[in-house]
Swiss-Prot record:
Lineage of source species: Bacteria, Pseudomonadati, Pseudomonadota, Betaproteobacteria, Burkholderiales
Annotated HAMAP family: Ribosomal_bS16
This protein's name: Small ribosomal subunit protein bS16
Family: Belongs to the bacterial ribosomal protein bS16 family.
Biological process terms in GO annotation: translation
Signal sequence, start to end: none
Keywords for the protein's UniProt record, in alphabetical order: Ribonucleoprotein, Ribosomal protein
Statement: the UniProt record of this protein carries the keyword Ribonucleoprotein: yes
Any one GO CC term of the record: cytoplasm
Origin: domain of life: Bacteria
């Protein structure tokens, strides 16, 4: 099953997450099919904290990919931010 979830990057104490489409059997930071966006929880005022390529996310959902709970929350947050 394909899932869209976070893959951790960054250094120690400085997390950075890629939003990726991957097979659910792969490791968290392992092989992935496609990078759909990123999330930077420590983004400053002038930095972009969240970017999701919406058309690719829609494609993956259309072919049956499941969103992880955290990614679903981030998508909702990103949609609210885009509407504002």
């Amino acid at each position: 099953m394909v899932v869209i979830r976070l893959a951790r990057g960054g250094s120690k104490k400085r997390p950075f997450f890629n939003i990726v489409a991957t097979d659910s059997r792969n490791r968290r930071d392992g092989r992935f099919i496609e990078r759909v966006g990123f999330y930077n929880p420590l983004a400053g005022e002038g930095e972009e904290g969240l970017r999701i390529v919406q058309d690719r996310l829609t494609y993956w959902e259309g072919v049956g990919a499941q969103l992880s709970p955290t990614v679903a929350r981030l998508v909702k947050q990103g949609a609210k931010k885009a509407a504002a």
